[in-house]
Amino acid sequence: MNPTHSQQPHLTIIGAGLAGCEAAWQAAALGVQVTLHEMKPTSFSPAHQSADLAELVCSNSLRGAGMNNAVGCLKEELRRCATLFMQAADATAVPAGGALAVDRDAFSRYITEHIEQHPLITLQRNEQCSVPPEGTVIIASGPLTSDALAPHLAQLTGSRHLYFYDAIAPIIEADSIDFSIAWKASRYGRGGDDYINCPMSRDEYMTFVEALKTADKVAGKDFEKVIHFEGCMPIEEMARRGDMTLAFGPMKPVGLPDPRTGKDPFAVVQLRQDNLHATLFNMVGFQTKLTYPEQRRIFRTIPGLQDARFARLGSMHRNTFINAPRCLDQHLRLTSDPRMFFAGQITGVEGYVESAACGFLAGLFAAGQLTDHAVPLPPATTGLGALLGHLSHSSPDDFQPMNVNYGLFPPLEGRKRKRSERRLAMAERALRDLEPWRQRVLSHIPDLKPFPAEDSDDV
């Protein structure tokens, strides 16, 4: 796929987030000229702050790094396929126990610089308010698709957009944390002292939960229907589900004994390193849509955070996605108009890694169509194939966003295995089955050594 410059096919991509950037990178690597449209800095969504591409607006964690977690398997697949996403993640990683977390600013800057420097990618910083009437297009406008573009996408897909809120967790300056109360440790001592832990007694916890239940929230727009995705549930919504929901969820204390007592507290608030210099820590699982004054008031009641300085307070934003099983084919093409591809969270995948994976595939599929080189589907036994299976084979009547998980993978044949053994066997099968597909589709990428299977400790 190396046509001369005058013969080079052209691809338009709308949206330069994780999916759009990865799609552009892959298509350009296969000799396609790409025009990548990004509305920042001309226009910002309610959740974005940086002019850089591929901005991480929720957590800075890319989740579990080991093979015992399906997202760890998917990351290794993307690593073996030489994705820009994994190059950036590995280059900007920060300590996070058994998870892979990144310095969010360095990560976005890495991707931005590589996109800007690629000779076949033209970055145009303007808001696309409609879809080009001609040519091959990838829509990767993300969960925060602009109000101007959304009606055009609704018309294209012939379906209503569904809205729910992804809530963003606060970030705290490390030197404002009281370490006479808080301490550093990872759960069960795995992965080093990568988390800061703030303990709560039963009375402190119950008071905290009650405060969350009665706190003022930011009101959503009248036309937005609130459908919360379980993986990014606001902490105040979890508190309303039951007094002990948080204690068995993001505030679970098991494996985190307080060094002052030697015993597990009743509940624990964990903070995870957010930048390379370890000056910023985000509150794990504390996505929220509380008003800013309420966040300061309530979160400063947490022992160890009484003097906390917030580098960023939590916020909420809309998530827009299409009914992929009804609208798209297996190659992420719009069934009613095969020149149109969709990629990223707007398709109904959920999470940073999944969005990048979807962009990776869309870029390959679009480039293949443009150059008359059909790109085969990845094996269903891989994380990549499992994601495509979710988008194409789920029931269209109750389709919802989904993180990658081993439940999406085909079951193993043969004898029954324990859960941990079964997951590792699925990962080994995925990486084994990926290789012939990778060699066929990405022949310019050299063979890589096997990746060791490890357990994950993603909190």
Curated annotation (Swiss-Prot):
GO terms for molecular function: flavin adenine dinucleotide binding; tRNA (uracil(54)-C5)-methyltransferase activity, 5,10-methylenetetrahydrofolate-dependent. This is Methylenetetrahydrofolate--tRNA-(uracil-5-)-methyltransferase TrmFO. GO terms for cellular component: cytosol. It is an enzyme of class 2 (transferase). Catalyzes the folate-dependent formation of 5-methyl-uridine at position 54 (M-5-U54) in all tRNAs. Keywords: Cytoplasm, FAD, Flavoprotein, Methyltransferase, NAD, NADP, Transferase, tRNA processing. It comes from Syntrophotalea carbinolica (strain DSM 2380 / NBRC 103641 / GraBd1) (Pelobacter carbinolicus). Signal peptide: none annotated.
